[in-house]
A protein has these predicted regions:
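Intrinsic low-complexity, repeat-rich intrinsically disordered segments enriched
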Residues: 1-59
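Acidic, glycine/polar-enriched metal-coordinating patches/loops
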Residues: 64-147
């Protein structure tokens, strides 16, 4: 395999079937480039309390554990068409609350109350209509299906 260091590559039909990028992404010659961040990897944000600003350039899917109440700030590097999920797990105390800044749009304009149980898991499913309008749907209290 050869290494090419450049900031711009034009990929034409030239006998090259696939380009492989050092971030784990590929280009299959169909005009699409897949980078590691678009494959569905979940970026763990760790324990969170207070202001939380997510950098959407780093991934599309995120997880965090609430150790206190949070304010979900407007994300940085949001691109129209981007989408993903934010998994919110409560610590062993539970009963954490949240608020969100204006980019985050929810049905009816009112954020739902997060689950209150210790170790409860909620999911914020999001899609960026524009760089400053993020449509969200919150799924509360994720639990295994009964068998």
């Amino acid at each position: 395999m050869s290494t090419l260091n450049t900031s711009n590559i034009k990929h034409e039909t030239s006998g090259i079937n696939t380009l492989v990028f050092d971030n784990g992404g590929t280009s299959g010659g169909n005009g699409r480039v897949t980078t590691k961040g678009t494959i569905g990897e979940i970026s763990a944000l760790g324990n969170k309390t207070g202001d939380v600003t997510i950098d959407f350039r780093t991934a599309n899917n995120f997880s965090m554990t609430l150790t206190g109440n949070i304010v979900l700030k407007n994300p940085s590097n949001c691109a129209a068409g981007q989408s993903g999920v934010i998994y919110i797990t409560h610590d062993g105390t539970g009963s954490r609350t949240w608020s969100a800044e204006a980019y985050w749009e929810v049905p009816g304009g009112t954020l739902p109350t997060l689950s209150t149980g210790a170790n409860a898991v909620d999911a914020v499913i999001w899609h960026a209509r524009t760089a400053s309008k993020i449509t969200t749907q919150v799924v509360l209290d994720l639990s295994p299906s009964p068998q």
